[in-house]
From Swiss-Prot:
The keyword Nuclease does not apply. Belongs to the NqrDE/RnfAE family. This is Ion-translocating oxidoreductase complex subunit A. It comes from the Bacteria. It is a multi-pass membrane protein. The chain crosses the membrane at residues 4-24, 39-59, 72-92, 102-122, 134-154, 171-191. PANTHER family: INTEGRAL MEMBRANE PROTEIN OF SOXR-REDUCING COMPLEX, ION-TRANSLOCATING OXIDOREDUCTASE COMPLEX SUBUNIT A. GO terms for cellular component: plasma membrane.
């Protein structure tokens, strides 16, 4: 149980996919204009990450490894992730058309979100069990959502601030993202090793 808690805390705070591993930067910069949109994207990515983690773990250890098909890992994982994203897209379109509209192109782009594929590959590289991989996926997704929502909140506040002309737009947003990443570095001592 302690091991699972360390995996969870490590994935959320210490090894945050966006702020420490620099995975998933496209949606981080593209969807984080409003907190509501960021939260919706975070929930969609959370669902995809957790389910993809379970599916790719099963695929790896029941199909790819036993039949010595490890060289197909990347393409097989992408196919699983693409299928899940299509399912999420259909669900969001039916249940929340406003959220679907606000996410725009970024919802289908979850398929190519390197955080989702990176998570699946990291699960295998770390040698996690099925339960550990699900906990790692949930922690990674919560960390992704946390970074997305925090950055969206900061961007909303920045719109109200008098920013010098040279820093308006992307420059101040990248500086803010860097400061947020520095803040998350403060969690580095939480998880040993």
């Amino acid at each position: 149980m302690k091991n699972l808690l360390l995996i969870l805390i490590g994935a959320v705070l210490v090894n945050n996919f966006v702020l420490a591993r620099f995975l998933g930067l496209c949606p981080f910069l593209g969807v984080s204009r409003k907190v509501e949109t960021a939260l919706g994207m975070g929930m969609a990515v959370t669902f995809v990450m957790v389910v993809a983690s379970g599916c790719t773990w099963v695929l790896q250890y029941l199909v790819l490894t036993p039949y010595h098909l490890d060289y197909l890992q990347t393409i097989a994982f992408i196919l699983v992730i693409a299928t899940l994203v299509q399912m999420v897209e259909m669900i969001v379109r039916k249940s929340s058309p406003v959220l679907y509209q606000s996410l725009g192109i970024f919802l289908p782009l979850i398929t190519t979100n390197c955080a989702v594929l990176g998570l699946a590959v990291l699960n295998i590289q770390q040698g996690y069990s099925f339960v550990q991989s699900l906990v790692f996926a949930f922690g990674g997704a919560v960390g992704f959502t946390l970074a997305l929502v925090l950055f969206a909140g900061l961007r909303e506040r920045l719109r109200l601030c008098p920013v010098p002309a040279a820093f308006r737009g992307t420059p101040i947003e990248l500086i803010t993202a860097g400061l947020l990443a520095l803040a998350f570095m403060g969690f580095a001592g939480l998880v040993p090793g």
